[in-house]
Amino acid sequence: MSLFSLWVMAFGLSMDAFAVSICKGLAMEKFQWCGALKAGLYFGLFQAVMPLIGFLLGVQFSEYITDYDHWVAFFLLALIGVNMLRESLSDEDDEDSCSNDFNFKTMMTLGFATSIDALAVGVTFAFLSVDIYSSVVTIGLITAALSIIGVKSGHFLGKKIKTKAEILGGLILIGLGVKILMEHTLFG
């Protein structure tokens, strides 16, 4: 996977955390850097650890599905992307994600919930030529930075950004899935 593709994937994966961070910022009466840094730490750490776990699981099963790995990568990324689009267009809103509470339990729950997609992407990494350690660091750092920016911008800009971020993230992941499939079927 090229560095550009990795950055695009990291950006796409970080959109759930970014959207929740915007909600956190919206709930703040007064902006607090401590809350923004906590969001960056929790979301960045979860987004880094989950693909590593997914990668390790994928490596365990890669010998059984090597002939179909590009299809697995495509379907996982497309499924995640479509789910992100569906969630962004629904009227449902998660009250916990939009509270101004940055306690351990809340942030652990949100960190896990926003990184499930990263676990599935980690499985796809097992089938691609990916330096897993630099990949998870890149994903974690980009997510941390965007989460901090999300809290800050949510505090100042309002609700309009949240849905657009989720739509963009979903489209990016679907696009990457199509790219992987095309590379292996048309050009591979």
Curated annotation (Swiss-Prot):
GO cellular component entries: plasma membrane
Any one GO MF annotation of this record: manganese ion transmembrane transporter activity
Domain of life, source organism: Bacteria
Main localization of the protein described in the UniProt heading: membrane
UniProt xrefs under InterPro entries: Mntp/YtaF, Put_MntP
Keyword match Cell division: no
Key words of the record: Cell inner membrane, Cell membrane, Ion transport, Manganese, Membrane, Transmembrane, Transmembrane helix, Transport
Pfam families, A to Z: Mntp
Membrane topology: Multi-pass membrane protein
Protein purpose: Probably functions as a manganese efflux pump.
Protein family: Belongs to the MntP (TC 9.B.29) family.
The name this protein goes by in its record: Putative manganese efflux pump MntP
Organism, scientific name: Mannheimia succiniciproducens (strain KCTC 0769BP / MBEL55E)
